[in-house]
Amino acid sequence: MISKKKSNSSNRWLSEHFQDQYVKEAKKQKIRSRSWFKLEEIDKNNRLFKPGMNVLDLGSSPGGWSQYAAKKIGKKGYILACDILPMKKIKGVDFFQGDFCNKKTLNLILTNLSNVNLNLIMSDMAPNITGCSSIDMPRIIEICKTVFTISDHVLSRNGVVLVKSFQGEGFNEFFAQMKNLFSKIKICKPKTSRSRSREIFMLATR
């Protein structure tokens, strides 16, 4: 049985979701998700994309970020996207379904990118949220660790990693560790994130 507290929380989220200006705008523009606008904001502030870039999108479904990236890099660019969930085809994006934290899927990623000069790895992925920080924080940090580990193998010199995390216990320590591994790293908090959201994005340059 679903608790009344959880039911009320879900109903409140649904109400906020459908009233959200970015959800409405995404529907109007036929954009796959409101996260498109987060990436647009981060890109405008940091100039992430250039025509002809090669991009890896981890945790890509439903495809908002891949959709935005494909528009920015043009026909000469390349995007490889991966998610455990299915994703409808996007022109200019190669997609395969699988868990990138799984060794078999990771090997497929590495094989597909073996001859690619990869400029950007991006991940808007989050674990299934429990609402319990002591569970959610280790899970999101583990995802971040995997993304950064993948970057060690495939990211070109001066390449960039953009990955979602949460503010909470353990993040500051993890961020300090990453400072030692990249020439530049900073935290981005898009205005397009929901006001109550703890999500932040790490932007790191090799």
Curated annotation (Swiss-Prot):
InterPro entries reported in the protein's UniProt record: RNA_methyltr_RlmE (IPR050082), RNA_MeTrfase_FtsJ_dom (IPR002877), rRNA-MeTfrase_E (IPR015507), SAM-dependent_MTases_sf (IPR029063)
Main location group: cytoplasm
Subcellular location(s) per record: Cytoplasm
Domain of life of the organism encoding this protein: Bacteria
Binding residues for S-adenosyl-L-methionine: G63, W65, D83, D99, D124
GO MF annotation terms: rRNA (uridine-2'-O-)-methyltransferase activity
Catalytic reaction equation(s): uridine(2552) in 23S rRNA + S-adenosyl-L-methionine = 2'-O-methyluridine(2552) in 23S rRNA + S-adenosyl-L-homocysteine + H(+)
Keyword tags: Cytoplasm, Methyltransferase, rRNA processing, S-adenosyl-L-methionine, Transferase
EC number(s) per entry: 2.1.1.166
Residues annotated as the enzyme's active site: K164
GO CC term, one of those recorded: cytoplasm
Family the entry assigns: Belongs to the class I-like SAM-binding methyltransferase superfamily. RNA methyltransferase RlmE family.
Protein task: Specifically methylates the uridine in position 2552 of 23S rRNA at the 2'-O position of the ribose in the fully assembled 50S ribosomal subunit.
Protein's name in the database: Ribosomal RNA large subunit methyltransferase E
Species the sequence originates in: Buchnera aphidicola subsp. Schizaphis graminum (strain Sg)
Gene: rlmE
